[in-house]
Amino acid sequence: MTTLNSTPRADGFHMPAEWAPQTQVWMVWPERPDNWRLGGKPAQAAHVAIAKAIARFEPVTVAVSAAQYDNARARLDMPNIRVVEMSSNDAWVRDSGPTFVINDRGEVRGVNWEFNAWGGFDGGLYAPWNLDSQLGGKVLEIERCPRYVTEGFVLEGGSIHVDGEGTLITTEECLLNRNRNPHLTREQIETILGDYLAVDKVIWLPEGLFNDETDGHVDNFCCYIRPGEVLLAWTDDPEDPNYSRCHAALSILENTLDAKGRAFIVHKMPIPGPLFATEEECAGVDQVHGSQERNPSVRLAGSYVNFLIVNGGIIAPSFDDPMDEKAREILQKLFPEHEVVMAPGRELLLGGGNIHCLTQQQPAPHKN
């Protein structure tokens, strides 16, 4: 594998928007019993449903441990799904995997961020995370993609969204958290994002969704739907702890121009619930020192914004909630040329994330 000493921007590469043409989507099989209940079996069933939904639109590669390889291969029984053996600590490939970048000559490379399990030993979600730290490089090696390495700079893919035209959205709650890059200022972080993703403007939302254990990842709160337009998780209930977070984000978006000088059009997506785990669901998770505790009294950070755009499709979570159909209608209206597929999201939410968190798109080569 070729490791490059330059930066994507210096080499003419940039991170494309999620709606750009894709070669495939990467996923990692969920199995750790101290995060996924009942040995991961319910989450694996949801994983299969999501992988098969994506595979209707484009190829999927699922990385799985040697112990679970036969099981995963048997259940992911579609020609468009490739299963490869790869060790990992958990399934969150959006965060542990690489970010792909492209240029105008038909080349694809990858950025291999440093990963510390959402905070390391200062509020991180599990230890060790050494296998997840290797995952980005392994994916790039399988794909024969040259890589850029950001030693000393921690970033998860779920903490950023880009429009492919120079603007990035993130949250202060995550990227300025002391457990990520305490040695860097906001300005230094913006410079690194510019160098490695070729963005010209970073828009900082104060916080993400309430109780998001990733420290407020933007992909669970606000996402691009096209240049100049975003979809923001929303509640009109002043008693909801998300109320102030949503309004603070809206204020920033309504009073900020993007890198192209455009004012934002902000669409609102209702937040489901409030949603909570049951005592039975929490009891099904192994209790291991150092892992995230599951508590039925703690509100879950459910969000319909945590969807994935694929070639011709939108794969969005459903929660067996009355708001599910409204969410589907909103997404279909916003993406009239895509087919909206609602996939089971509750088991993923119980594990701490959702569809966007558990997937990583690989862009197709592009030539001008």
UniProtKB/Swiss-Prot annotation:
Supply the alphabetized keyword list.
Hydrolase, Polyamine biosynthesis
Tell me what reaction this enzyme catalyses: agmatine + H2O = N-carbamoylputrescine + NH4(+)
Matches recorded under Pfam families: PAD_porph (PF04371)
Tell me which InterPro entries the record gives.
Agmatine_deiminase, Peptidyl-Arg-deiminase_porph
Question: Which GO MF term does the entry hold, naming one?
Answer: agmatine deiminase activity
EC number of the protein: 3.5.3.12
Q: Name one GO biological process term.
A: putrescine biosynthetic process from arginine
Q: Residues in the active site?
A: C357
The record, for HAMAP family, names: Agmatine_deimin
Summarize the protein's role: Mediates the hydrolysis of agmatine into N-carbamoylputrescine in the arginine decarboxylase (ADC) pathway of putrescine biosynthesis, a basic polyamine.
Q: Which NCBIfam families match?
A: agmatine_aguA, PRK13551.1
Subunit (UniProt): Homodimer.
Per its record, how is this protein called by name? Answer: Agmatine deiminase
- Read off the lineage from the record: Bacteria, Pseudomonadati, Pseudomonadota, Gammaproteobacteria, Pseudomonadales
